A protein has these predicted regions:
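Hydrophobic alpha-helical segments within soluble ligand-binding/sensing domains
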Residues: 93, 157-181, 222-224, 247, ...
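Beta-alpha junction/loop-to-helix N-cap segments that form part of ligand/metal-binding clefts
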Residues: 26-28, 37-39, 52-59, 67-144, ...
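Extracellular/periplasmic periplasmic-binding protein-like sensory domains
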Residues: 152, 251-326, 338, 396-399
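Extracytoplasmic ligand/sensor domains, especially the bilobed periplasmic-binding protein
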Residues: 105-212, 262-287
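Segments of small-molecule ligand-sensing domains
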Residues: 310-322, 333-392
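Hydrophobic alpha-helical
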Residues: 115-126, 228, 236-257, 328
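Short, low-complexity disordered leader/linker segments with a strong preference
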Residues: 1-39, 397-399
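Extracytoplasmic "Venus flytrap"
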Residues: 28-62, 84-91, 113-114, 185-194, ...
Length: 399
C-alpha cells in the first residue's frame, strides 16, 4: 500500500475506457490491471474528525490486501492499494479521487469514507468509468441508481443502509419499549439526513410524530442546547444520528441536567470506542447494528485468528471499523475472482450482478447483488452496551 498526502496539482491524463454493450451503455475502465497487479484506491479520514473510523478501516483493508496477496493474489495478480487522506473534507476527497483516477490509474475505488466526501467525489469516478465499491457510508445515494443514468450502475454498497436500518431499529424499540415521546438529534449532512429520513418514515408508518427534532453541525462539540430542548420536550426515547464524540458528548450533557431517556444510536454508534471512551456514561445505550462485534478474548475459529492477526500487525485491538475495511477488500477479491483470469471492468460488473453470494467470516448477512439491486442486505440488529461491551439484543430485524 502507498499512502500519499493530498497535493492540489493533479495530472490530467486521460482514462482509458471500454464501452459496455447496449444493455446498459455503461462506460467502465480497464485501467489499473496488469499481468501482475490490480490497482485499487481509497480515501479515508486519517487525520480529521472521524479518524477513529478512517484509521482502523484502512488497517482492516491492509490486512485484507496482505491476506489476498499472501495467497497468490487474484488469478496471479497482487492487489496494490493506494490510500489518500481526505480529512473528512469533501473538497479534499474530490482532489484525492481525481489524483487516483488520473495519475494512479486505479481500477476501482474501494471503501471510500464518509457520506459528504463520497457524495462530493463520486461523479469523478463515474465520469471516468471507475466503479465505486462498498463505500463507508450507508446513504441511499451509494446504491440507488437510475437506469436512465448508466454510469450510476458503477456503484455498489455492502453496508447496512441508514434509512432501512433506522426504520427497523426504531420499529423494534418503539414496539418493545413503548415510549410516549420519540425524539431525534442528527448530524446536519447526508449521513444525518438519511437517519432522519428513516426515523420519520417509520414514525409515519406507525402513525406517530416526533416529539422533538434537533440537529448539529459536523464537528460540533457543545450539545447543551440540544439536550435542554429534548428534556423540555419530555423526550423518553432519543435516536442519535451521531458518530462517536457527539454520542458521548450528548449523553454527558444529558446526565448533567438529569435527562435520562432511552438512547438509541444509528449504525455508526455501534463501535468499540463508544464504551471504551464513554465508560459508565454509556451503559445501557442501544445501537442499530449490522453484525456482532468481535472481541479478541472471546472470539473463536476464523474470527479469533483474524483478531490475533490484526493485533499482531497493528498492536491494537480490532474493532468493527476494521471488520468493515477487511470485508471491503475480501468482497472485492471474491467478485474479481469470479470475474475470471482475463479481468476487465465489464467482467467485474457482470460478476457483481450475478446474484452469487459472498459470506464473510464474521457471520454477517450474505452479500448479494443483481442487475437491478446494488445493495447487499437490509437485515438489521439492535445491540446494547452491557458491562462495557456491545451485546446482541435482537437480530434479523426488518421493518
Amino acid at each position: 500500500m502507498r499512502l500519499n498526502l493530498l497535493k492540489p496539482a493533479l495530472l490530467g491524463a486521460a482514462v482509458g475506457l471500454a464501452a459496455l454493450p447496449a444493455l446498459a451503455q455503461t462506460k467502465v475502465t480497464n485501467q489499473g490491471i496488469t499481468a501482475t497487479e490490480i490497482v485499487l484506491g481509497t480515501h479515508q479520514d486519517l487525520s480529521g474528525p472521524i479518524k477513529v473510523w478512517g484509521v482502523p478501516v484502512l488497517n482492516g483493508m491492509q490486512l485484507g490486501v496482505d491476506e489476498v496477496n499472501a495467497k497468490g493474489g487474484i488469478h496471479g495478480r497482487k492487489i496494490k492499494l493506494i490510500a489518500e487522506d481526505s480529512q473528512y473534507d469533501p473538497k479534499k476527497a474530490v482532489l484525492a479521487s481525481q489524483k487516483m483516477v488520473e495519475k494512479d490509474k486505479v481500477f476501482a475505488m474501494v471503501g471510500p469514507m464518509g457520506s459528504p466526501t463520497v457524495l462530493a467525489s463520486q461523479d469523478v469516478l463515474f465520469d471516468a468509468g471507475v466503479p465505486q465499491l462498498f463505500p463507508l457510508t450507508a446513504a441511499e445515494f451509494t446504491f440507488k441508481f437510475d437506469p436512465k443514468k448508466p454510469q450510476e450502475r458503477l456503484k455498489f454498497s455492502n453496508l447496512l443502509p441508514y434509512v432501512e436500518s433506522t426504520r427497523a431499529g426504531v420499529k423494534y424499540m418503539v414496539e418493545w419499549k413503548k415510549p410516549k415521546a420519540v425524539c431525534i438529534m442528527y448530524q446536519d449532512d447526508e449521513y444525518g439526513k438519511n437517519v432522519f429520513d428513516g426515523f420519520t418514515q417509520q414514525l409515519n408508518a406507525m402513525k406517530m410524530k416526533a416529539a422533538s427534532v434537533t440537529t448539529y453541525k459536523r464537528g460540533a462539540s457543545d450539545f447543551s442546547a440540544q439536550a435542554a430542548k429534548m428534556k423540555s420536550d419530555s423526550c423518553d426515547m432519543v435516536l442519535m444520528g451521531t458518530v462517536i464524540r457527539e454520542t458521548i458528548g450528548l449523553m454527558a450533557e444529558a446526565k448533567k441536567i438529569g435527562f435520562a431517556p432511552i438512547w438509541l444510536g444509528a449504525t455508526p454508534v455501534n463501535v468499540l470506542e463508544i464504551p471504551a471512551l464513554g465508560k459508565e456514561l454509556v451503559e445501557g445505550l442501544y445501537a442499530i447494528a449490522g453484525f456482532i462485534i468481535p472481541y479478541r478474548d472471546t472470539s473463536t475459529g476464523a474470527v479469533k485468528a483474524w483478531c490475533e492477526a490484526y493485533f499482531k500487525k497493528f498492536g491494537i485491538e480490532p474493532n468493527s471499523q476494521a471488520v468493515i475495511g477487511y470485508n471491503v477488500v475480501m468482497t472485492f477479491a471474491h467478485y474479481a475472482e469470479l470475474a475470471g483470469k482475463d479481468l476487465t471492468g465489464q467482467k467485474l460488473l457482470t460478476a457483481l450482478e450475478s446474484g452469487k453470494e459472498y459470506k464473510d467470516i464474521f457471520g454477517s448477512p450474505p452479500t448479494k447483488f443483481s442487475a437491478t439491486n446494488h445493495l447487499a442486505t437490509t437485515i438489521t440488529q439492535v445491540q446494547q452496551v452491557k458491562n462495557g461491551r456491545w451485546v446482541l439484543v435482537k437480530g434479523d430485524l426488518l421493518f
